[in-house]
Amino acid sequence: MLALLMRWFFTIFLTGIIVEGAVSFRNEVLPVLTRQGCNAGTCHGSPSGKGGFALSLFAFDAAADHRVLTKDFLSRRIDVLDPHLSLLLRKPSNDLSHRGGLKLPKDSREYRILHDWISDGCPIDSPATPACVGIEIQTNGPSVLHWPQPTAKLRIMASFADGAKRDVTHLVQFSSSDEAIATVQPNGTVKGVRRGLSAVMVRYL
Protein backbone atom coordinates (compact mmCIF):
# COMPACT_ATOMS: atom_id res chain seq x y z
CA MET A 1 0.00 0.00 0.00
CA LEU A 2 1.38 3.35 -1.00
CA ALA A 3 1.30 5.79 1.88
CA LEU A 4 1.68 9.52 1.80
CA LEU A 5 3.40 10.83 4.92
CA MET A 6 2.12 14.17 6.09
CA ARG A 7 3.26 16.31 9.01
CA TRP A 8 1.13 19.16 10.29
CA PHE A 9 3.17 22.29 10.86
CA PHE A 10 1.65 25.60 11.81
CA THR A 11 2.66 29.17 12.46
CA ILE A 12 0.70 31.44 14.80
CA PHE A 13 0.80 35.20 15.03
CA LEU A 14 -0.63 36.48 18.31
CA THR A 15 -1.82 39.78 19.83
CA GLY A 16 -5.22 39.49 18.14
CA ILE A 17 -8.22 40.91 19.95
CA ILE A 18 -11.91 40.38 19.47
CA VAL A 19 -14.96 42.62 19.75
CA GLU A 20 -18.03 40.66 20.81
CA GLY A 21 -21.01 41.22 18.53
CA ALA A 22 -19.05 43.15 15.88
CA VAL A 23 -16.60 42.29 13.14
CA SER A 24 -13.10 42.37 14.60
CA PHE A 25 -10.59 44.37 12.58
CA ARG A 26 -7.62 42.51 14.01
CA ASN A 27 -9.06 39.00 14.09
CA GLU A 28 -11.30 38.98 11.02
CA VAL A 29 -10.64 41.86 8.61
CA LEU A 30 -6.84 41.63 8.61
CA PRO A 31 -6.83 37.80 8.38
CA VAL A 32 -9.09 38.07 5.30
CA LEU A 33 -6.54 40.38 3.67
CA THR A 34 -3.71 38.02 4.63
CA ARG A 35 -5.61 34.96 3.41
CA GLN A 36 -6.07 36.57 -0.01
CA GLY A 37 -2.41 37.59 -0.22
CA CYS A 38 -3.19 41.32 -0.19
CA ASN A 39 -0.49 42.16 2.37
CA ALA A 40 2.15 39.77 1.05
CA GLY A 41 5.55 41.07 -0.01
CA THR A 42 4.64 40.59 -3.66
CA CYS A 43 1.51 42.70 -3.33
CA HIS A 44 0.45 45.65 -1.13
CA GLY A 45 2.71 44.43 1.66
CA SER A 46 5.85 45.34 -0.29
CA PRO A 47 7.84 48.36 1.01
CA SER A 48 6.49 50.55 -1.79
CA GLY A 49 3.03 48.96 -1.91
CA LYS A 50 1.14 48.52 -5.17
CA GLY A 51 -0.75 51.19 -7.07
CA GLY A 52 -0.29 53.72 -4.27
CA PHE A 53 -1.79 51.34 -1.70
CA ALA A 54 0.61 49.99 0.94
CA LEU A 55 -0.23 47.69 3.85
CA SER A 56 2.07 46.43 6.59
CA LEU A 57 3.65 43.09 5.74
CA PHE A 58 1.34 40.29 6.92
CA ALA A 59 -0.59 42.83 9.03
CA PHE A 60 2.15 43.36 11.64
CA ASP A 61 0.95 46.96 12.23
CA ALA A 62 -2.83 46.87 12.67
CA ALA A 63 -3.13 50.55 13.60
CA ALA A 64 -1.25 51.67 10.48
CA ASP A 65 -3.36 49.38 8.29
CA HIS A 66 -6.56 50.77 9.79
CA ARG A 67 -5.39 54.31 9.04
CA VAL A 68 -4.42 53.42 5.46
CA LEU A 69 -7.78 51.76 4.81
CA THR A 70 -10.00 54.40 6.40
CA LYS A 71 -8.13 57.72 6.19
CA ASP A 72 -5.59 57.71 3.38
CA PHE A 73 -6.47 58.34 -0.27
CA LEU A 74 -9.10 60.88 0.88
CA SER A 75 -10.96 57.97 2.53
CA ARG A 76 -12.01 56.72 -0.92
CA ARG A 77 -11.18 53.11 -0.10
CA ILE A 78 -14.17 52.97 2.25
CA ASP A 79 -17.80 54.00 1.71
CA VAL A 80 -19.68 53.61 4.98
CA LEU A 81 -22.98 54.79 3.47
CA ASP A 82 -22.85 52.18 0.71
CA PRO A 83 -20.20 49.55 1.52
CA HIS A 84 -20.57 47.86 -1.89
CA LEU A 85 -19.07 51.01 -3.45
CA SER A 86 -15.91 50.80 -1.34
CA LEU A 87 -12.72 50.34 -3.34
CA LEU A 88 -11.72 47.77 -0.71
CA LEU A 89 -14.55 45.60 -2.07
CA ARG A 90 -14.88 46.70 -5.69
CA LYS A 91 -11.26 46.02 -6.61
CA PRO A 92 -10.82 42.44 -5.29
CA SER A 93 -14.33 41.47 -6.44
CA ASN A 94 -13.38 42.59 -9.99
CA ASP A 95 -16.15 45.18 -10.02
CA LEU A 96 -13.30 47.51 -10.99
CA SER A 97 -10.10 46.61 -12.81
CA HIS A 98 -7.75 44.86 -10.39
CA ARG A 99 -4.24 43.78 -11.30
CA GLY A 100 -4.44 40.97 -8.77
CA GLY A 101 -7.55 39.50 -10.39
CA LEU A 102 -10.60 38.11 -8.61
CA LYS A 103 -9.88 37.66 -4.90
CA LEU A 104 -13.26 38.19 -3.21
CA PRO A 105 -16.35 36.89 -5.02
CA LYS A 106 -19.39 38.86 -3.90
CA ASP A 107 -21.06 35.74 -2.55
CA SER A 108 -18.04 34.73 -0.46
CA ARG A 109 -17.86 34.74 3.32
CA GLU A 110 -14.74 36.91 3.18
CA TYR A 111 -16.54 39.57 1.13
CA ARG A 112 -19.35 39.60 3.69
CA ILE A 113 -16.89 40.08 6.56
CA LEU A 114 -15.36 43.16 4.95
CA HIS A 115 -18.79 44.48 3.95
CA ASP A 116 -20.16 44.13 7.48
CA TRP A 117 -17.09 45.77 9.00
CA ILE A 118 -17.51 48.77 6.70
CA SER A 119 -21.25 48.87 7.37
CA ASP A 120 -20.50 48.97 11.12
CA GLY A 121 -18.39 52.11 10.61
CA CYS A 122 -14.95 50.44 10.32
CA PRO A 123 -14.38 50.03 14.09
CA ILE A 124 -10.97 49.17 15.46
CA ASP A 125 -10.73 46.72 18.35
CA SER A 126 -10.70 47.94 21.93
CA PRO A 127 -7.48 47.19 23.85
CA ALA A 128 -9.67 45.73 26.62
CA THR A 129 -11.01 42.87 24.52
CA PRO A 130 -9.59 39.33 25.01
CA ALA A 131 -6.39 38.47 23.17
CA CYS A 132 -5.85 35.40 21.03
CA VAL A 133 -3.59 33.05 23.00
CA GLY A 134 -3.26 30.07 20.68
CA ILE A 135 -4.64 27.95 17.88
CA GLU A 136 -5.26 24.22 17.56
CA ILE A 137 -5.21 22.21 14.36
CA GLN A 138 -7.83 19.48 14.28
CA THR A 139 -8.10 16.84 11.55
CA ASN A 140 -10.74 14.29 10.65
CA GLY A 141 -8.12 11.64 10.01
CA PRO A 142 -4.53 10.53 10.66
CA SER A 143 -1.51 12.53 9.53
CA VAL A 144 -0.46 9.62 7.31
CA LEU A 145 -2.64 9.64 4.19
CA HIS A 146 -3.19 6.40 2.31
CA TRP A 147 -4.18 5.70 -1.26
CA PRO A 148 -6.65 5.42 -2.95
CA GLN A 149 -8.18 8.32 -0.98
CA PRO A 150 -5.25 10.41 0.27
CA THR A 151 -7.25 13.31 1.70
CA ALA A 152 -7.82 14.94 5.07
CA LYS A 153 -9.75 17.97 6.29
CA LEU A 154 -8.17 20.45 8.70
CA ARG A 155 -10.11 22.58 11.16
CA ILE A 156 -8.46 25.49 12.95
CA MET A 157 -9.69 26.54 16.40
CA ALA A 158 -8.48 29.77 18.04
CA SER A 159 -8.45 30.23 21.82
CA PHE A 160 -8.85 33.62 23.49
CA ALA A 161 -7.80 34.94 26.88
CA ASP A 162 -11.35 34.86 28.23
CA GLY A 163 -11.60 31.12 27.55
CA ALA A 164 -13.64 31.47 24.37
CA LYS A 165 -12.89 29.26 21.36
CA ARG A 166 -13.73 30.03 17.77
CA ASP A 167 -13.48 28.17 14.47
CA VAL A 168 -11.22 30.35 12.29
CA THR A 169 -10.68 27.92 9.41
CA HIS A 170 -12.24 30.43 7.01
CA LEU A 171 -9.81 33.14 8.18
CA VAL A 172 -6.45 31.36 8.01
CA GLN A 173 -4.00 31.02 5.16
CA PHE A 174 -2.90 27.48 4.31
CA SER A 175 0.21 26.57 2.35
CA SER A 176 2.07 23.37 1.52
CA SER A 177 5.85 23.16 1.63
CA ASP A 178 5.83 20.88 -1.42
CA GLU A 179 2.78 20.95 -3.68
CA ALA A 180 4.27 18.18 -5.80
CA ILE A 181 3.60 15.91 -2.80
CA ALA A 182 0.47 17.44 -1.29
CA THR A 183 -1.83 20.38 -1.91
CA VAL A 184 -4.05 22.22 0.55
CA GLN A 185 -7.21 24.11 -0.37
CA PRO A 186 -8.49 27.34 1.24
CA ASN A 187 -11.13 25.31 3.11
CA GLY A 188 -8.45 23.15 4.76
CA THR A 189 -8.75 20.07 2.54
CA VAL A 190 -5.36 18.37 2.12
CA LYS A 191 -4.89 16.08 -0.87
CA GLY A 192 -1.92 13.83 -1.51
CA VAL A 193 -0.36 13.92 -4.97
CA ARG A 194 2.45 11.39 -4.63
CA ARG A 195 4.42 9.58 -1.97
CA GLY A 196 6.60 11.78 0.24
CA LEU A 197 6.66 14.19 3.18
CA SER A 198 5.18 17.67 3.07
CA ALA A 199 4.57 20.28 5.76
CA VAL A 200 1.35 22.29 5.91
CA MET A 201 1.66 25.78 7.35
CA VAL A 202 -1.30 27.63 8.84
CA ARG A 203 -1.07 31.40 9.30
CA TYR A 204 -3.54 33.24 11.51
CA LEU A 205 -3.18 36.83 12.71
What are these regions (language model features)?
Residues 17-205:
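Aromatic- and Gly/Pro-enriched helix-to-coil junctions and flexible linker segments
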